[in-house]
C-alpha cells in the first residue's frame, strides 16, 4: 500500500474528526476530489500548495463548489454516480459553520501531506486517493479501521497482469469499491501502448460513496468517456440497463441546459454589447497562473 497515500488519508481523517464531526463524510471526500483535480504541473506544485494554504475558508469552499459545478458541466455522464458529492456542494442542504471550518481544515491537511505529489502526471495513474480515505472515514478514524482497506494498489496491479485485461473491449468490475482494479488495468494498458479511452469501463458497487469516489477517480485516472457506473447489488439487480438509461437522460438534460445557457448569453450580449477594447499599451497580457487553468 502506498505509504504517502496512507499518510494523506490519515491526515484528512484526523482533521475531519478533530472537528468533532461524525456524519456527512461525503464533504471531506468531495473536497479532496476537487483539490486533487487541480493537479498542477511539477514546477507549479510547491507554489500552488503555498497559495492554497493561504486561502481562507470562504475562498476554499468557493473553489470546491466551482470545481463541482465544472464537473457537472463537463461530465454529465457521471452526474448520477457522483450525486452524493454534487449534492453536497450544489444541493439544498447548506453546510453548517462547523462543517465549513472542518472542510477548510481537511483541505489544508491534505495539502500539508503533499497531496499534489500524488496527482503529478507521473504519479496520478498509480494511486487511489480514496480507497484508504473512505475506509478510515467510515470507520471513524485510523485507530478504528483495522485492516478493512480496499484492494491495495500493488495487489490490484498484480491482479490486472494475471487477468490479462489489456486486450479487452470492455472491462467489468462487479464489486469495484473506489476502482482499484480499474486503475491497475488502465495503468497496464498505458504500459503496453494502449489508450484507456478505447475501452468501456463498467463498474458497480453497493456503496454509493465508493461509486462517487470512483466517479472522481475517472477524472484523475483519465479513463475517458466510455464509463458506466452504478450503485446496486449485482446479486439481485439487473443494473446495467437502468444505469444506461439514467446516463442517457442526464446527458440529454445537460445538453438542453447548455443550449439554453448559450441562447441566454447571446441575448444578453445583444442587449448589452461589449465596447471595443482600447489598444494595449504595455505588451502582451500575462499568462494565466496555474490556479486559473481548467482543472478537468
State the predicted function of each range.
Residues 25-32, 127, 131, 153, ...:
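Non-catalytic, well-ordered alpha-helical scaffold segments
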Residues 211, 216-296:
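S-adenosylmethionine
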Residues 15, 117, 136, 140-143, ...:
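Alpha-helix C-capping/helix-to-loop hinge sites
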Residues 43-139:
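Long recognition/docking surfaces used for binding and targeting
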Residues 1, 118-122, 148, 203:
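Generic alpha-helical structural element
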Residues 1-76:
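Charged, often flexible domain-edge or linker segments that flank or initiate folded functional domains
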Residues 145-240, 244:
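Conserved S-adenosyl-L-methionine
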